[in-house]
Amino acid sequence: LIQKGLTGDLMKELMTLIHKENIVVQKVPIQKLNHMVKKNHQGIIAMISPVAYHEIDWLVQQVYEKGEDPFILILDRVKDVRNFGAIARTAECFGVHAIVIPSKDSALITNDAVKTSAGALFKIPVCKVTSLTSALDFLKGCGLKVYACSEKSETLIDKLETTGPKALIMGS
């Protein structure tokens, strides 16, 4: 969160870095910042994830090195933190090795997401990628078969042959 109306060379430099890292920015009135924190905020409040993000290439390699078939969940435009947490909780029960999310148009991993996940977000690595298409191409190149969920499908997931390395796409 950045206070509306902040200007200057340092602000320009900060905004350049923010855009380079694909960080979501919201400009808000100073009153909102004052309400959120009681200490000096200098016009900026950063919300950081309670979990660290991982690199997808490293994770897939680690799963293969353990002698397991990767099972990767890809979430496309899941924006509600509680839905994200509930999906992570279910994914952990089904043995998902990692969750892949886009750096834009995705729920942030907040305390609410972690709480709803019942701690699953501390167990399942999350990968944040700039392009889901590139991530899918990478996963296919690693031998994963890709499945996509749709409410319009006539085939139920339990009827699919899902042995071997796989990625499952879910979204809104």
PLM regions and their residue ranges:
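N-terminal positively charged helical leader segments and presequences
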Residues: L1-Y64
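Short basic, glycine-rich beta-strand/loop surfaces that mediate nucleic-acid
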Residues: M36-S49, S117-A120, T163-G171
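Short amphipathic alpha-helix with an adjacent loop that forms part of the alpha/beta core around
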Residues: D57-E65, F138-K140, D158-T162
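Amphipathic alpha-helical repeat scaffolds
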Residues: D76-A86, S131
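Histidine/lysine/aspartate-rich catalytic loop segments that bind and position anionic ligands
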Residues: H97-T155
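Active-site/ligand-binding-proximal alpha/beta "capping" segment
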Residues: Y147-S172
